[in-house]
Amino acid sequence: MTQELSFEEAIQRLEQVVRELESGDLPLERGLELFQEGVALARHCTALLDRAEARIEQLLERDGGVETLPFEPE
């Protein structure tokens, strides 16, 4: 299911998972399930960002031969 989420949906769900984990009122098994889901969501978001970065670099390369530099947020 994670693979079907947009970046925004995955981040929103990840924030919910973090809030639930931070509440501290969870049985161990539920906490482990949420942790596992959070890791999967974080990996999904990273993969989506990596793809977006590659697309940006390709566009820069194609539109005028501009030197491609890795995207580095401020």
From Swiss-Prot:
Molecular function terms, GO-annotated: exodeoxyribonuclease VII activity
Subunit structure: Heterooligomer composed of large and small subunits.
Upper classification of the organism: Bacteria, Bacillati, Bacillota, Clostridia, Eubacteriales
Family under the similarity heading: Belongs to the XseB family.
Coiled-coil residue windows: none
Paired cysteines (S-S): none
SUPFAM superfamilies in alphabetical order: XseB-like
Protein's recorded name: Exodeoxyribonuclease 7 small subunit
Keywords: Cytoplasm, Exonuclease, Hydrolase, Nuclease
Annotated compartments: Cytoplasm
Database matches in NCBIfam families: PRK00977.1-3, PRK00977.1-4, xseB
Catalytic activity: Exonucleolytic cleavage in either 5'- to 3'- or 3'- to 5'-direction to yield nucleoside 5'-phosphates
HAMAP family from the UniProt entry: Exonuc_7_S
Domain of life where this protein originates: Bacteria
Protein's job: Bidirectionally degrades single-stranded DNA into large acid-insoluble oligonucleotides, which are then degraded further into small acid-soluble oligonucleotides.
GO cellular component, one term: exodeoxyribonuclease VII complex
Major site of localization recorded for this protein: cytoplasm
Source organism (scientific name): Symbiobacterium thermophilum (strain DSM 24528 / JCM 14929 / IAM 14863 / T)
Keyword Nucleotide-binding part of the UniProt annotation: no
